């Protein structure tokens, strides 16, 4: 690492790598750890003999950062009067000096700092050359902490490095938000009444594990497989019910054997979904929070059309007659037809058992700003190209499909999204030039937010996958610890604090290694 010499040049003085800065907590603001004065100097002196020749403090300063010695002229620090090194020049006593550094050797007039030597090497290069960049081998947030310690503003960073730092700060803010949500959820869970030792509490724990955690055991896996099977059956039944022959019978108010079988299948599926919804409601700890869940709202929207159809039917089936599924929608008109089409929402129930669908929902929630920017870009481009293609086609005398500017909006949408149905095609050369510009602009506009959305999707998928692996590892650990207690196996909240800490340590040892983030 190049270092300043006594005559203002750069030369290496000593290369010993000391200890780095302590780790900061991931979701807390950076805090400076108080050091024990006097220990760092003695620790360095034990390593090797350093050049103890005193320096002239009026012209230069001798500092030792992590075992590396630097000799800097005071004139190098004139541009940064608020930096930590510049403040050392104003100190008049040993007490004032140790407030700014970790230790001070009065014999050699050497200042000691227990900080990262690699980061300070970059700062030294910045003081000498005026260019400040991030270290590739160091976390951007750790480097930000080093800059704050030495009193160097982040605005001096190069533009590309500053953008990288801002992205890291946004990721940290998102992690802090998720952490707060997890803490609030855990607080809500700990507020429930302590009834675990009762038989009712044990039954609720078993039921909760079965309906919410398919990996908890054989009952949970069977319950999840049945739920997926009924969802697939409902989707197939809905598709078959739209066949032309069945639609003709429905329009005529008739019901054949096929229609009867479809109605029976639909009834069985709705009965299962209703039972599953009731079980989830019974085991829910917070009933109000249960009805606010997105998947629970989808369940209500998917199940209710069947019961609404039964309630509004004016001709209920009599005893001995075959109930007709189509007769329930015959006299309710378009509203019930739309409600019946909502049965396709059953497919969204697969999100309870699909990690990919859960990742998709989490990505949509995290990328609301990116989706908003995408819609904004499309709206601006559509507003720009629609009048242009309308004017180009109108002036050429070939106005066929482009009857107005609002009618041209549809053409701009399908062109910029590269769909191109072909129902509206510009015929003139100016119109075709506008179409070419619209298509190229659409490709660029769609590509800008897509990169960020893809990055968020990959990050969310790895995050959910890691949480699932940790949960499975914890369940395996609890099952292998022997007959601790049935209550502890069913509900982790009643486990002792010592056992929970052991579980966390086992997860760290068993799970795949993750990169350590220095803050």
From Swiss-Prot:
Parts of the chain in the membrane but not crossing it: 406-417, 418-425
Annotated localization: Cell membrane
Keywords: Cell membrane, Ion channel, Ion transport, Membrane, Potassium, Potassium channel, Potassium transport, Transmembrane, Transmembrane helix, Transport, Voltage-gated channel
Membrane spanning stretches: 219-240, 262-283, 295-314, 329-353, 369-390, 433-461
Molecular-function GO terms, alphabetical: potassium channel regulator activity; transmembrane transporter binding; voltage-gated potassium channel activity
Region (Disordered): 1-25
Motif (Selectivity filter): 418-423
GO aspect biological process, one term: regulation of potassium ion transmembrane transport
Pfam families: BTB_2 (PF02214), Ion_trans (PF00520)
Entry GO terms, CC: membrane; nucleoplasm; plasma membrane; voltage-gated potassium channel complex
Residue spans, topological domain Cytoplasmic: 1-218, 284-294, 354-368, 462-519
Residues exposed to the Extracellular side: 241-261, 315-328, 391-405, 426-432
Its membrane topology: Multi-pass membrane protein
Family of this protein: Belongs to the potassium channel family. G (TC 1.A.1.2) subfamily. Kv6.4/KCNG4 sub-subfamily.
Quaternary structure and partners: Heterotetramer with KCNB1. Does not form homomultimer.
Job of this protein: Regulatory subunit of the voltage-gated potassium (Kv) channel which, when coassembled with KCNB1, modulates the kinetics parameters of the heterotetrameric channel namely the time course of activation, deactivation and inactivation and on the voltage-dependence of activation. Potassium channel subunit that does not form functional channels by itself. Reduces the deactivation rate. Modulates the threshold for activation by shifting by approximately 20 mV in hyperpolarizing direction.
Domain topic, free-text comment: The transmembrane segment S4 functions as a voltage-sensor and is characterized by a series of positively charged amino acids at every third position. Channel opening and closing is effected by a conformation change that affects the position and orientation of the voltage-sensor paddle formed by S3 and S4 within the membrane. A transmembrane electric field that is positive inside would push the positively charged S4 segment outwards, thereby opening the pore, while a field that is negative inside would pull the S4 segment inwards and close the pore.
Name of the protein described by the UniProt record: Voltage-gated potassium channel regulatory subunit KCNG4
Source species of the chain: Homo sapiens
Gene name of this polypeptide: KCNG4
């Amino acid at each position: 690492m190049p270092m300043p010499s006594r005559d203002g040049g750069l030369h290496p003085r000593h290369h010993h790598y000391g200890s780095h800065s302590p780790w900061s907590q991931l979701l807390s603001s950076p805090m400076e750890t108080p050091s024990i004065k006097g220990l760092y100097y003695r620790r360095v002196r034990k390593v090797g003999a350093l050049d103890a020749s005193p320096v002239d403090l009026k012209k230069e300063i001798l500092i030792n950062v992590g075992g590396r010695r630097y000799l800097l002229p005071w004139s190098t620090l004139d541009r940064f009067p608020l930096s930590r090194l510049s403040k050392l020049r104003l100190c008049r006593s040993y007490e004032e000096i140790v407030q700014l550094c970790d230790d001070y050797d009065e014999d050699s007039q050497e200042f000691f700092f227990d900080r990262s030597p690699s980061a300070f090497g970059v700062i030294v290069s910045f003081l000498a050359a005026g260019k400040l960049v991030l270290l590739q081998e160091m976390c951007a947030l750790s480097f930000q902490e080093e800059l704050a310690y030495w009193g160097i503003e982040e605005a001096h960073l190069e533009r590309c490095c500053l953008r990288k730092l801002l992205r890291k700060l946004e990721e940290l803010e998102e992690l802090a938000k998720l952490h707060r949500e997890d803490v609030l959820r855990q607080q809500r869970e700990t507020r429930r009444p302590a009834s675990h030792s009762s038989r009712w509490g044990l039954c609720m724990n078993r039921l909760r594990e079965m309906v919410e955690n398919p990996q908890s055991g054989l009952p949970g896996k069977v319950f999840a497989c049945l739920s997926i099977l009924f969802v697939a059956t409902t989707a197939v039944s809905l598709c078959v019910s739209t066949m032309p022959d069945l639609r003709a019978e429905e329009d005529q108010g008739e019901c054949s054997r096929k229609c009867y079988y479809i109605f029976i299948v639909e009834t069985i599926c709705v009965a299962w979904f209703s039972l599953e919804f009731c079980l989830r409601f019974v085991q829910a700890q917070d009933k109000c929070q249960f009805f606010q869940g997105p998947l629970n709202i989808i369940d209500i929207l998917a199940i209710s059309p069947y019961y609404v159809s039964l309630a509004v039917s004016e001709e209920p089936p009599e005893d001995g007659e075959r109930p007709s599924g189509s007769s329930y929608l015959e006299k309710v008109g378009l509203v019930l037809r739309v409600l019946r089409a909502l049965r396709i929402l059953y497919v969204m129930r697969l999100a309870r058992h699909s990690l990919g669908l859960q990742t998709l929902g989490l990505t949509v929630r995290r990328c609301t700003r990116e989706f908003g920017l995408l819609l904004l870009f499309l709206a601006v481009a559509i507003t720009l190209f629609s009048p242009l293609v309308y004017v180009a086609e109108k002036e050429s005398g070939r106005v066929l499909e482009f009857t107005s500017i609002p009618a041209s909006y549809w053409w701009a949408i399908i062109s910029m999204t590269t769909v191109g149905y072909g129902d509206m095609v510009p015929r003139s050369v100016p119109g075709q030039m506008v179409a070419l510009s619209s298509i190229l602009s659409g490709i660029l506009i769609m590509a800008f937010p897509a990169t960020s959305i893809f990055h968020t999707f990959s990050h969310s998928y790895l995050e959910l996958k890691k949480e699932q692996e940790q949960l499975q590892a914890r369940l395996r650990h609890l099952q292998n610890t022997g007959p601790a207690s049935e209550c502890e196996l069913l509900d982790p909240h009643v486990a002792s604090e010592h056992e929970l800490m052991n579980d966390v340590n086992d997860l760290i040892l068993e799970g795949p290694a993750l990169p350590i983030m220095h803050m």
